[in-house]
From Swiss-Prot:
Its main location: nucleus. It comes from Arabidopsis thaliana (Mouse-ear cress). The gene is DREB1F. InterPro entries: AP2/ERF_dom (IPR001471), AP2/ERF_dom_sf (IPR036955), DNA-bd_dom_sf (IPR016177), DRE1A-I (IPR045277). GO terms for biological process: glucosinolate metabolic process; regulation of gibberellin biosynthetic process; regulation of timing of transition from vegetative to reproductive phase; regulation of unidimensional cell growth; response to freezing; response to heat; response to water deprivation. This is Dehydration-responsive element-binding protein 1F.
Length: 209
């Protein structure tokens, strides 16, 4: 199918919805889908030779539902199908028959190909720095003085003394003299100033043949 032969939904403006429920829930551009429960999108198509509709399922995004619609109309109408996306003609799988169950299964599989990454299952969301994190100090979820008492009771006096000693050693580190081996290497012949080191690097790139 050539791109010139593809019929897109955006090329055919929708008719005004008669009932209020369809006016408020249907998508302004995509065909065959409408909003349900505020954040879900449902999809269904009508068979060309019958008045019955084929239910294609509920999806978390409008794009996924629109892709399911394109799979169904490609199976039912072929080259005369009005698609929501131009690349659906070659990108989506086409059901091998017009059986509603087959169309529904292939449409659902095709829609999953376009599921956003942030909606995939199995993703672990790490807490932010400002979130409350349960460190396992107790089964309760209290806050304020109660949680502070649990945190303080989990540390003994020896732990505080060890932490205090470590902090004092870190504070005294910059005041201590460097080791003798380091001082012996710091002779006038091998000490570079910052400017000399800069020119040393520049000579590698400024050498002329």
């Amino acid at each position: 199918m050539n791109n010139d032969d593809i019929i897109l939904a955006e090329m055919r403006p929708k008719k005004r919805a008669g009932r209020r429920v369809f006016k408020e829930t249907r998508h302004p551009v995509y065909r065959g889908i409408r909003r349900r429960n505020g954040d879900k999108w449902v999809c269904e198509v009508r068979e060309p030779t019958h008045q019955r509709r084929i239910w294609l399922g509920t999806y978390p995004t409008a794009d996924m539902a629109a892709r399911a619609h394109d799979v169904a109309v490609l199976a039912l109408r072929g080259r005369s199908a009005c698609l929501n996306f131009a690349d659906s003609a070659w990108r989506l799988p086409v059901p091998e028959s017009n059986d509603p169950d087959v169309i529904r299964r292939v449409a659902a599989e095709a829609a999953e190909m376009f599921r956003p990454v942030d909606l995939e299952s199995g993703i672990t969301v790490l807490p932010c720095a400002g979130d409350d994190v349960d460190l396992g100090f107790g089964s309760g979820s209290g806050s304020g003085s109660g949680s502070e008492e649990r945190n303080s009771s989990s540390y003994g006096f020896g732990d505080y003394e060890e932490v205090s000693t470590t902090m004092m050693r870190l504070a005294e580190g910059p005041l201590m003299s460097p080791p003798r081996s380091y001082m012996e290497d710091m002779t006038p012949t091998n000490v570079y100033t910052e400017e000399e080191m800069c020119y040393e690097d520049m000579s590698l790139w400024s050498y002329r043949y």
